[in-house]
């Protein structure tokens, strides 16, 4: 699942929105709480909305970080190739203090179709909703 937007704010501002985990609850409709220190191998703990009637707590693991440019994380794979995931956020600076923000999510393994049935509607609402919210929050902060 991929979403791409061009944000009317510099990459530094968009990066600050994405990595200001303590403030996710102020603007993010999909992840209402997040704790992470962006160290490869460290946990990222999230409270995810819109996947079930109640929020779901998730712990995933930081896979990559290029400061100011990208970070990604994934769940611990379930044995025998049953399920694995990857989520990434990538920023590309553009001319005129604009930024391309790319949001990517993938889910693989033989349990992926079942997870898709259970949470697919939430994924289709949540990931694009967060992308739009990142855009709005970055533009709001830049306009200050």
Place the predicted regions along the sequence by residue.
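Hydrophobic ligand-binding cavity/cleft-lining segments
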Residues: 1-39
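Hydrophobic/aromatic beta-strand elements that line small-molecule binding cavities or substrate pockets
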Residues: 3-5, 57-64, 85-93
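Glycine-rich portal/gate segments that line the openings of hydrophobic small-molecule binding cavities
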Residues: 35-80, 129-144
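Beta-strand/loop substructures that line and gate deep hydrophobic ligand-binding cavities in soluble
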Residues: 76-129
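Short strand-connecting beta-turns/loops that link adjacent beta-strands
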Residues: 10, 39, 67-68, 94-98
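Short solvent-exposed loop/turn micro-motifs enriched in small/polar/acidic residues
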Residues: 27-29, 55, 82-84
């Amino acid at each position: 699942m991929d979403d791409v937007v061009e944000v009317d704010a510099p990459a530094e501002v968009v990066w600050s929105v994405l990595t200001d985990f303590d403030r996710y609850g102020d603007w993010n409709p999909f992840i209402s709480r997040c704790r992470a220190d962006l160290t490869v191998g460290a946990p990222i703990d999230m409270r995810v909305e819109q996947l079930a009637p109640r929020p779901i707590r998730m712990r995933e693991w930081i896979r990559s970080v290029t400061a100011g440019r990208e970070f990604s994380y994934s769940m611990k794979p379930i044995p025998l190739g049953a399920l694995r995931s990857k989520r990434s956020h990538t920023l590309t600076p553009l001319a005129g203090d604009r930024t391309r923000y790319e949001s990517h999510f993938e889910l693989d393994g033989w349990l992926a179709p079942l997870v898709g049935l259970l949470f697919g509607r939430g994924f289709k609402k949540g990931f694009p909703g967060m992308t739009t919210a990142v855009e709005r929050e970055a533009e709001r902060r830049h306009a200050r």
